Amino acid sequence: MESEGIEHRTVQVNGINMHVAEKGHGPLILFIHGFPDLWYSWRHQILALSALGYRTVAPDLRGYGDTDAPASPSSYTCLHVVGDLVALLDTIAPDQEQVFVVAHDWGSIIAWYLCLFRPDRLKALVSLSVAFSPRNPQRKIIKSLQAVYGDDYYICRFQEPGVIEAEFAQMGTTRILKEFLTYRNPGPLFLPKGKGFGRPTDAPIVLPSWLSEDEVNYYATKFEKTGFTGGINYYRNLDLNWELTTAWTGAQVKVPVKFIVGDQDLVYNSPGAKDFIHKGGFKKYAPLLEQVVVMEGVAHFLQQEKPDEINTHIHDFIKNFH
């Protein structure tokens, strides 16, 4: 990828060293990746949008890739991660008071918090896969998930430090990444102990046309070095984030938004999600929600599966805000 003019550097922000990939000049687009992912998730968008006259910036979030991974699980709250990104923008683009944000998966969760905490910093948001989720003051998140899905649900299995990491280590880094990146079951993801992803760990995984062995190997090289703990720590802070954000109960997102999701995405198919997105709930909490796009036959990693369409969707939206 370096040969295509993507520049890499390390920036000191918020007490950590953050690795950033960037290319291009013009209005800044900040790309925020999810789990288990890297700046690399946005490789197609970086090339396309920089060619259209934007400065594309894609960091590895704390805990990922070539960015520092603090040891304490409680160093991965929404306040830490939003703090990293605001500090990054202050450092690399002090002249750009507002930027575009494109986010996916956990990156979208972080982007929604960014909208709540610092709406003054965003021109517009394109959120992929994960819609805004209003805070329920009555019930903590993990208890809610356990009540709906049971203890084998992947987010519940992620809670106990070290447990899922040991199971992932047994299966092997490359295998885990292939399982996640190629996951197309629209139903919830269960990871029962000792059962992995529900198929024998020596069963071959055929990669889709949009994901090559070389691309998987790039991921594997980075995750071999870091392990999965940094990324999983985000899930371990769901309840702490809930506690820390009491003051934002009922708050609206006052940023222009475009939301894009695949109809095979497990998040889109979770209980209540479609009704919330399409029947007024989403628009109530994000009154500047301008477009909802549902991509047929597309699963969770849509920016990699359908890069050309996603690039067009991003550009068609953000060009209205110059």
Q: Could you say what each language-model-derived stretch is?
A:
Residues 2-7, 17-18, 28, 64-102, ...:
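Flexible "cap/lid" subdomain of the alpha/beta-hydrolase fold that forms the substrate-access gate
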Residues 287-322:
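Catalytic active-site module of serine/aspartate enzymes centered on a nucleophile-bearing elbow/loop
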Residues 19-69, 104:
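Conserved HGGG/HGGXW glycine-rich cap/lid loop of the alpha/beta-hydrolase fold
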Residues 35, 39-42, 106, 112, ...:
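Signature tryptophan residues that serve as conserved aromatic anchors
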